[in-house]
Design a protein with these regions (language model features):
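C-terminal alpha-helical interaction appendages
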Residues: 1-157
């Protein structure tokens, strides 16, 4: 049996950690991770060869490493759940719900309406997305009968 050994690379490890925290749905995209880590390493080496300092070269490499990864659907869902549903949903459910919602077709159709660029979170469209996601999640909770906490009595409804 042949096994492949994963190459240890600073940029690969850095990207994998970032994806795990902000894009858990992408942590197994090995081709993407390898290519992006290689691009970042090349950018770093090129910057050093051009006379840039090591810290500046790392900044330049990080720009390559995280290109297209500044806006996270996962983080957006976490934000909506924490800000809008913290009192209604028991905490273990909040934590488990994000990856499930990320795969939900209704949630995906909301995200698909928007061009999610790196700077989308600072755009006026972000508020519309946030509001639509909130409404969609309310419907998902109602349709699926998810347990909610009555904020006045703190009991399961």
């Amino acid at each position: 049996m042949t096994t492949t050994k994963k190459e240890l690379s600073y940029f690969r490890l850095k990207l994998e950690a970032y994806l795990g925290e902000h894009f858990p749905e992408r942590v197994n995209e090995n081709t993407f991770i390898t290519a992006r880590a290689d691009e970042a390493l090349t950018a770093y080496c090129d910057a050093i060869a051009q006379g840039f300092s090591h810290p500046k070269a790392e900044v330049m490499a990080s720009e390559v490493l995280y290109q297209g990864l500044h806006f996270s659907k996962y983080n957006t869902l976490v934000s909506v759940l924490e800000n809008e549903f913290e009192k209604e949903l028991p905490s273990p459910l909040l934590e488990r719900l994000t990856p499930i919602l990320l795969k939900n077709k209704a949630v995906q159709s909301v995200f698909d309406k928007y061009e999610l660029t790196d700077d989308f979170g600072a755009s006026p469209e972000y508020e519309k997305l946030y509001t639509e996601l909130t409404g969609t999640i309310v419907l998902i909770i109602e349709v699926n009968g998810l347990p909610t906490v009555d904020s006045e009595n703190m009991t399961l409804m």
